[in-house]
Structures are given as C-alpha cells and as structure tokens.
C-alpha cells in the first residue's frame, strides 16, 4: 500500500494552532480536495473533528476514545497500526492528513510527501516533522496568493 503524507506547513514548521489551521491561503486547499477525491484519508480524531467529513472520501480515524461509527465512510481505530492493517486490505493508496502526532508516527513509512509550504512564519503549537533523510524533492511549483506558497513533492529514494 502506498502511503502519501499531505500537509500545509509554515516556513517555521507550524501546521496548526490548537484545533485550527492558523492561516487561510486562497486556492491552496484545491489541490488537497482534488488529490484526495474518492481516496482513503488517515487522520487523528482532532483533525477529523476540525476538518469535518468531506464528501466523496473515506476516513480511517485514530482515536483513544472508544467511538463506533454508523457511517460506512468513517472507521475508527485505537492505533495507527490497526488502521494500517485495515487499510492494507481496503485500498492500494492512503493519504495521511494530520495531525502532528499522526504525521510523526508515519513519516518514516511514507512513500511520498506532498507539502504546501506557506511563505510566512506562523505562531502555533502543532508541527510537521522534518522531512527524513532518504527523501528527494521531485517537484516544486510556486503560487502567488493572499499568502504566497510553494507546492513540493518529496519521494523516498
């Protein structure tokens, strides 16, 4: 199963402040919406609660709480490992979409990392881990918006 991480991160590594994304960059989320359409997303519960359920996606939500879902598109798991075991039988590709603890747990297992680097230093308390050695940047495109950003793809190997 291919594992892709996808995140928007400030120049100083921030991805969140509490449950919020501490910026709004016009157009930046369109790529996320397009790439994750009809895909499985692996997220933590706080991220799922803050983003809400987007249409035409399936969610594997990792939580310490014992939650049962009646929605066939939302499945809860007690650990990242149990989510991966389930997803390995359900799909050939997942998008890991946060939060900080989930990224940290899976960054070394990722095959591809999709980053939108927001060209601003932002205050926050949730961070994206450094891209590990062994990843190589394979694509970069800059965008002008209300806050400029650069979309990057990093691939293992």
From Swiss-Prot:
Residues 2-156 form the DHFR domain. Gene3D superfamilies: Dihydrofolate Reductase, subunit A. GO terms for biological process: dihydrofolate metabolic process; folic acid metabolic process; one-carbon metabolic process; response to antibiotic; response to methotrexate; tetrahydrofolate biosynthetic process. SUPFAM superfamilies: Dihydrofolate reductase-like. InterPro entries: DHFR, DHFR-like_dom_sf, DHFR_CS, DHFR_dom. GO terms for molecular function: dihydrofolate reductase activity; NADP binding. Its EC number is 1.5.1.3. It holds the Pfam family DHFR_1. Pathway: Cofactor biosynthesis; tetrahydrofolate biosynthesis; 5,6,7,8-tetrahydrofolate from 7,8-dihydrofolate: step 1/1. Coiled coil: none annotated. Keywords: Antibiotic resistance, Methotrexate resistance, NADP, One-carbon metabolism, Oxidoreductase, Plasmid, Trimethoprim resistance. One of its GO terms (cellular component) is cytosol. It catalyses: (6S)-5,6,7,8-tetrahydrofolate + NADP(+) = 7,8-dihydrofolate + NADPH + H(+). PROSITE patterns: DHFR_1, DHFR_2. Key enzyme in folate metabolism. Catalyzes an essential reaction for de novo glycine and purine synthesis, and for DNA precursor synthesis. Belongs to the dihydrofolate reductase family. Homodimer. This is Dihydrofolate reductase type 6. It comes from Proteus mirabilis. The lineage of its organism: Bacteria, Pseudomonadati, Pseudomonadota, Gammaproteobacteria, Enterobacterales.
């Amino acid at each position: 199963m291919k594992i892709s991480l996808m995140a928007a991160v400030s120049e100083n590594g921030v991805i969140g402040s509490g449950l919020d994304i501490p910026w709004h960059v016009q157009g930046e989320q369109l790529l996320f919406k397009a790439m994750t359409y009809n895909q499985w997303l692996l997220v933590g519960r706080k991220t799922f609660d803050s983003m809400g359920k987007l249409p035409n996606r399936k969610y594997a939500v990792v939580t310490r709480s014992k939650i049962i879902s009646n929605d066939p598109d939302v499945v809860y798991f007690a650990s990242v490992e149990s989510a991966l075991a389930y997803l390995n039988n359900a799909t050939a590709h997942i998008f890991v979409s946060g939060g900080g603890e989930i990224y940290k747990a899976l960054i070394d297992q990722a095959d591809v990392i999709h980053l939108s680097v927001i060209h601003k230093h932002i205050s926050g308390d949730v961070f994206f881990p450094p891209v590990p050695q062994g990843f190589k940047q394979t694509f970069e495109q800059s965008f002008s918006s209300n806050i400029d950003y650069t979309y990057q793809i990093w691939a293992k190997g």
